[in-house]
């Protein structure tokens, strides 16, 4: 690192390499010229490695945005879990990753060993046998054990997600082409449409293709049940950070639940191909304090469909 600092700050350092004719200069691979001084200098391997390290650090600093708490371009991992179900799914995913990695390494190593150990050069006369009882038992029993180990926590999470606990709030969700309609039956059937905000109406704090004109608002630390259906074709109500993806099927009501402890806005999208503007059906759930939620309910005007569809951004 000291060499790198000297390289960028002291021309004398470059002169040193220019004048040095000792055998150690044979190690230097890179030659360049300083336009400000006219000096030609060679760059030592350590300095080259240092410049690569700086570039790598800069890349990591920029790419760490991919691990932020909201969906971003080029994101390579999950959003941080915001609900009990998603926390369990996150841990289960990591658990499966260890098992999958071990299996891949074992199979790849075994394949490489067999290719080298039993090729035609090393074994000009191949062995002749049709089966091996011990090996067949092993490759049957071990996968069964692995599947059982995977199944136990998987069924536990599935049961936790399917069993609706005592809820503090119920919200009805109806999917239409191409917007969402929400109803709060616990609050005098308060209802409203939720349509994606167009590009020309976006504000600095809005997320393009994700923010809507009317968000779902729920209180923090409240158990919320969603009753989900559709009014035309099949849609899917999905919010990754909350760990649910529930199909909205016409003529059928599906349900799920969530509980969010952290205030903020959590985004999702329709995750079932539902027509030409399927990609313009975002979901935005805003989590606020209980006091703010009560104030929002009090100030929110009731809306009615009146047999009319809202004006869609995508139209």
UniProtKB/Swiss-Prot annotation:
The enzyme's E.C. designation: 7.1.1.9
Intracellular or extracellular location(s): Cell membrane
Binding site for Cu cation: 235, 270, 274, 278
Origin superkingdom: Bacteria
GO biological process, one term: ATP synthesis coupled electron transport
Main EC class the enzyme belongs to: translocase
The protein's required cofactors: Cu cation; heme
Classification of source organism: Bacteria, Pseudomonadati, Pseudomonadota, Alphaproteobacteria, Rickettsiales
Transmembrane segment boundaries: 54-74, 96-116, 133-153
Major site of localization recorded for this protein: membrane
Encoding gene per record: ctaC
Key words of the record: Cell membrane, Copper, Electron transport, Heme, Iron, Membrane, Metal-binding, Respiratory chain, Translocase, Transmembrane, Transmembrane helix, Transport
Protein name according to UniProt: Probable cytochrome c oxidase subunit 2
